[in-house]
Amino acid sequence: MEQQKPYIPNNKVRIVTAAALFDGHDAAINIMRRIIQSTGVEVIHLGHDRSVEEVVNTAIQEDANAIAITSYQGGHNEYFKYMYDLLQEKGAGQIKIFGGGGGVILPSEIVELQAYGITRIYAPDDGRELGLQGMINDLVQQSDYAIGDKLTDEINHLEDKNPKAIARIISSAENFPDVAAKTLEDIHKKNENNTSPVPGITGTGGAGKSSLVDELVRRFLSDFPEKTIGLISVDPSKRKTGGALLGDRIRMNAINSPRVYMRSLATRQSNLALSKYVADAIQVIKAAKYDIIILETSGIGQSDTEIMDHSDVSLYVMTPEFGAATQLEKIDMLDFADLVAINKFDKRGALDAIRDVKKQYQRNHNLWDVNPDEMPVFGTIASQFNDPGMNTLYKA
C-alpha cells in the first residue's frame, strides 16, 4: 500500500488527546497522537483514564481546535454525549470531538453519536480504507480553522478569571499578533501596578520539572485556600514538522481545580526554550488577577538562561547524573538561579552531587563567607508523596 502524505494544516492546530475514563488502553491513543503530531499539530496529551470534565476544561483552557479520544471501555455513548453537552454548556461548542474504539463502538452507535453532534467516530473499516495517516489527515483537515483571528470583549471578562477569555487572548497573541495588539496594550496598562510574582522553573529535559511544579502547586493550593495560580508551560516544536507534544499535563495531578489556570505553549521556533509569546501570556494571566504565575520552560542546554528575562525568581532543576564536577562549570543557569533542585535524589551518587553543586553555586555567586551547606540547593524526589526535600524547597 502506498504511503500517504500527511496533510499540511493552514493554521496552527491544537488538539487535546486522551483515553477515556476507566480506560487503561493507551496504545491506540499513543499511536494516534504521534501521527497527529507528525502531521504538524500541537498535541496536548493527557494520557489515559481521563474524565469528561478534565478533558473539556483542558480543551477550553488550551483553546484547542478539537478533542481526540479513544474509548475501549464500553461507556462510549454516555462519555461522548456528555462531552458534547458539557462543551455546549460551557460555551465552547466550536471545539470538535473525534473518537475511535475499534470494534467496541458498534456501527449503529457511530451513526447515533454522529447524529448527536460528535464530528466523527472512526470505525475499523475506516482504518482499512483510509490507513492511519488517512484517518489523521481527515481529522486534522476538519480541525484546521483559525483561532484568535478576532477579539470582541474578552478583556472585560479577564478579572472574572474566565478561562475562555484568557485562552482566546493568548491564542490571538500567538496566531494573530496584529489583531491582539490593541488588547495587549490595554492589558499592559492594566498591569502597571500588578505585583503578582512570576517564579520561573527551568532545567534539562527529563529532570522532572513538571512533576516538581505539580508538587509545588499541590502544596500552594492546600496552604492558601483563597489564592489562585496560573501556569504557563512551554514545550519544544519539532523543526521538521512544526508539530509539538505539549505533554506537561500528563504529570500534573493537582491542577484540576477552579483556582488553577494552565496554558501549554509550543516554542514555535527551534533551539529556544521559550515561546516568544510567553511575555504576552504572562501579562494576560496577570490581568486576570492570578496571585502567582509559574513559568516552566522546555528542557534546556548548558548555555540557556532565557528564563531570566521573564521571571522574578528562578529555580533550576537538574538530576544527580550530570557527569564530572567540571560539567557544572559550564552550566550558565548556576550563575543566575536563585534556587537549585537536584531532583530524582534517590539515584546513586546523589549526596556527592549535592555537595558538588553547592560548592559550584558558592563559587559562581562569590559567597565565600557562607558555609557551602547553606547554599539554596535542595535534593528532591518529586515523584514521592510528601517528600521532605520537596517540603524544604517549597518553604524556601
Name the predicted role of every residue range.
Residues 13, 194-199, 375:
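Pre-Walker A (Motif I) flank of P-loop NTPase domains
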Residues 15, 22, 29-134:
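Cofactor-cradling patches in redox/metallo enzymes
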Residues 212:
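Hydrophobic positions on the alpha1 helix immediately C-terminal to the Walker A/P-loop
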Residues 23, 204-207:
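ATP-binding Walker
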Residues 112-136, 140, 335-396:
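Canonical P-loop GTPase G-domain recognition
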Residues 171-196, 207, 216-317:
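Nucleotide-state-sensitive switch-loop elements of NTP-binding domains
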Residues 132-198:
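Extreme N-terminal, non-catalytic leader segments
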Residues 74, 297-301, 310-327, 337-338, ...:
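Conserved Switch II/interswitch segment of TRAFAC-class P-loop GTPases
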